[in-house]
Amino acid sequence: MPFERCISNEDKEGDYFMKNIFSREELLIGKENVEKLKKSKVAVFGIGGVGSYVVEALARAGIGNFVLVDNDNIDITNINRQIIATTKTIGKAKVEVAKERILEINPDAKVNTYKEFYMPDNKIELTSNISYIVDAIDTVTAKIALIQEADALNIPIISSMGTGNKLEPTKFEVEDIYKTSVCPLAKVMRKELKNRGIKKLKVVYSKEEPIRLEINSNNKVPG
């Protein structure tokens, strides 16, 4: 049965979506926490192999406000690993396709998009009302700049390390940057962040040896 026939006009005009789409989640975490998610604002930098799945998961979890930052358009080579990439979205801006997916999941969500590269000389102004930042950027210098800004504004942030050229998903861990090992990107980041006085950073990284990977501060990170 088409979705339009499953809900009444009264449901469409009320808060049907938050009460029903996230009703199973409410059973798990409680109404108060569902409301917290609804009021939260998450900024995701980099809507690629990592960031696109982060956005999808957060939307389905009930996050109510998003800031999406990425300058890329979807390419045919993205289809094998990015959830926003299909034959119908090739050539479209990643941030706009991600926004459309969010609103298809939760029409009540608020989404601000920035089709820009986040770099030290081209920063998106962050505000204190951001609840959390997800760093899924693929350039080391940009990652460092974002982490520094989040630290200065006291905004919680989690950073994705290298995910490309790896095959074993069970090797991924959430850890502080200074407790990481094996990951070439994490090694570079530890050095750069230590030099800048950053004392801690939550990261997602893999202990799997990459098939082939060389990282320095000017490289893009496969993902």
Q: Which residue ranges define each predicted feature?
A:
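Hydrophobic/small residue at the entry helix of a nucleotide-binding pocket
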Residues: 50
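Conserved S-adenosyl-L-methionine
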Residues: 60-65
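Glycine-rich phosphate/adenylate-binding loop
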Residues: 12-19, 38, 126-132, 137-145, ...
